[in-house]
């Protein structure tokens, strides 16, 4: 039986861009990732898929990159040849993943091992969990409803494409939905349908396998885990964001220039994002908190630094759909170029409640790391003492409880 994942390219581009930095700059780093389902309830306990998940992980760890896949990666100008040589030898190791359940029917997944291994498991495991869960709920009516919703999105994108003013910055969306997709075949169907409806709007996908197959642009730069790792590397905690951004610049020399802002919140990020970084990076990515407030803060920051914000890109990727994206574009288009990464709403809008699942970095080199998100529900760590210390170091107040 072919596994759910049948290509190691079937993941997000930023896994490759981050892994390349890890391999070149801190290959000895050890890390721990933990799974969490944020849903209050599910149709049936996730523990029920444990046996199938174990089998899928076994199949995943038998995969290797093909010469064709390696050739594609080599064609991306920011991927270095020695990294591709490393990937030719690469194989995920099953021993680094532990799967368990608890008495409440919850699924427990831990990935612990070298970061150059552990980091690469995340998207695969989330996509597998999603597909196993929704496979049991699939009926012809579910597919019919998914198709109806997809056709409505395609029609709306056609309307927007017709309404766009060619003299204004373009409205551009990308598929960011690999981790929470219904299944790979559906993700591909969604991208093909929207591309056909509005080729001027659909910019690409974060999924490298589908970007290669469909001949579109793979999209992505960095994730929270990259910046979080620097909380445990050889730098003062107060300087971890600067060290991470400096490391990125050293690796990519101006390529992949979109920085993620919400590891310790936008205000703390902007205190570190000085003139040097603001000139070097092409723009910023929003992934939590109020996107309008966030974008206005970004605009004020560029103004203060006397940088023309119209030369910069704001990328939004937090819980978006087409209407929210279009509204944000209308609000910011006079001040910024914009881009929108839409995830679950594209790849798993079938009428069911989607799974809100994550696999997050919680330790690096035996030391806790944390994300102090602009959305309190997205804060994640396994160490409340470290979280309090992080708040103190960056002057971030405790969130008010309602």
Swiss-Prot record:
Q: Can you cite a GO biological process for this protein?
A: NAD biosynthetic process via the salvage pathway
**Which pathway does this chain act in?**
Cofactor biosynthesis; NAD(+) biosynthesis; nicotinate D-ribonucleotide from nicotinate: step 1/1
Q: Does the keyword Ligase apply?
A: yes
Key word Cytoplasm present: no
- What does its PTM field state? Transiently phosphorylated on a His residue during the reaction cycle. Phosphorylation strongly increases the affinity for substrates and increases the rate of nicotinate D-ribonucleotide production. Dephosphorylation regenerates the low-affinity form of the enzyme, leading to product release.
Q: Name one Pfam family in it.
A: NAPRTase
InterPro entries the record matches: N/Namide_PRibTrfase, NAPRTase_N, Nic_PRibTrfase, Nic_PRibTrfase-Fam, Nicotinate_pribotase-like_C
**Keyword annotations:** Ligase, Phosphoprotein, Pyridine nucleotide biosynthesis
Residues where Phosphohistidine is found: 224
Q: List the disulfide bonds.
A: none
UniProt-listed Enzyme Commission number(s): 6.3.4.21
Give GO MF terms, alphabetically. nicotinate phosphoribosyltransferase activity
Its GO CC terms?
A: cytosol
Instruction: Give the catalysed reaction(s), semicolon-separated.
Output: nicotinate + 5-phospho-alpha-D-ribose 1-diphosphate + ATP + H2O = nicotinate beta-D-ribonucleotide + ADP + phosphate + diphosphate
Q: Which CDD domains match?
A: PncB_like
Family the entry assigns? Belongs to the NAPRTase family.
Known function = Catalyzes the synthesis of beta-nicotinate D-ribonucleotide from nicotinate and 5-phospho-D-ribose 1-phosphate at the expense of ATP.
Please identify the protein, giving its name as recorded. Answer: Nicotinate phosphoribosyltransferase
> Gene behind this chain?
pncB
